[in-house]
Amino acid sequence: MKKISRSVSVSMLVLSVVLAALASAPLMAQDWSMFGADTTNASNNGSSISNSNVSRLAVKWTVTTGGDVSARAAVVANVAYFPDWGGNIWAVDTKTGQVIWSHKLSDYGLPAGTVSRTSPAVQGDKIYLGTQKGAWLLAIKANKGDLVWMTQLETQDPYAIVTTSPAVQGNVVYTGVASQAEGASLFGADLSTAVARGSVVAVSANKGAIQWKTYTVPTGYTGGGVWGSNPVVDPSRNTVYVGTGDNYSHPQLGAPSSKPGVTFQDCILKDTEANCLSPDDHVDSILALDMSSGALKWSRRMVTWNQIYAMNGSDDWNVDCLYGLSQCPSNPGPDYDFGSAPNEITYKDSRGKSHTIIGAGQKSGIYYALDPDTGATLWQTQAGPGSSLGGMEWGSASDGQRIYVAIANYYGLPSAAGSAGSWAALDPATGAILWQVADPNGASDIAPMSVANGVVYAGSLSQNATAPTMLALDATTGHALWNFAPGVSVNAGATIVNDTVYWGSGYSNLGLGTGGNHTFYAFSVGGN
């Protein structure tokens, strides 16, 4: 038998102890360079702020903006970058709160009134963000705010928008396109002639040239918008992961249906799935795309044929349905979008073995965990009630120990957490709900979650001016550790870097919340 020297054995033992310690150690603090902190879209970072001192958070400084701030800030090299609903983009010194530069988006040649609600992505000397009008993607010099290039990602749909925050990997920017045609009558769109199709787009980071573009629905269909958080980009798998929204409308059916001219709703009552659902209608789905070409690797549609049949329709839905306006489909669906891209989550099982899942929360209230290579469902959990303004919307977070989700429940449907919004933590291995707490304001919760060093940060849509709409929760128990009342609703996610929490306030889009204080906050322990 070959002998191993005692010194080698001791060295291996020491190495194993060190590796075990590193595996269980908190994430090291680093920059937060895009919506979800990085291309895993996990919204997780290290921080010196913990559950033992977060109760002493106080305002460090504020910036008066030109509008509500619902985009999560990117913070890189001691500069915070964020847009506001007044059409401005800001760069702020994180040490002092002094504005380094700010520009109107219209200064770059875009129409007056153009706004961005995307979190900037920062790489090197550039920041990247999308627009709420015209579906433009911009590259801007980080130091002075000068325009480098801008590219229109969709030219066929006059209502096209970019609300997906960009992700940058290597020399490519990845983002999604949605459409305000879903607002139909509210925005003057005629869905009978609309060409609104969601897409995922890859753009050269240096030049702005479109490298590939993949539509989520076929020609003749509308919808499939890609509209929340930032895409997951996994170079090890050469894969981009996104979530999609519902159809706004279906065409009258020709091929492959045997009944040309039959409406979609009639077809599903009388025909088969193969004849009624286009295999390329990737709505309410999680998609895996090839990073290099945009080719579809797999798609998982999470509204099933049986659900569609039970609805006597499809998941055709638009904003007209909220107000009983004329372009709402006769049999509207439930509007079960994936309002954000997935999270790529790596966790350790009880034996210490690492596993990676693609997790995504849907407006149905279900959070799904999928195999990243095949799309197979590993587990699914009903975390709260679903509706057109329910379930999970703008983004979840994970530290690898738990997945943190916000439940909107705007309509006050009964649930285990009561008849309002809530926040919950799920086990990444099983989907079991580990804790769930109600919004203390009795409000809806659609803001993206953040987590850092055992503390979860959550925003409330409460319209009560005295309500604490910024909250910090214990990641292990969900117990409230800190709160702050900015006087308005909060739909921005918190950004946590080192010893500071950066947070925008105000949200009045579609009348869902309140705004008007025009303030961006930095918090630190003791305000120091």
Language-model segment annotations:
Residues 11-24:
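Bacterial N-terminal signal peptides
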Residues 93-96, 141-144, 204-207, 291-293, ...:
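Short loop/turn segments that connect beta-strands within beta-propeller blades
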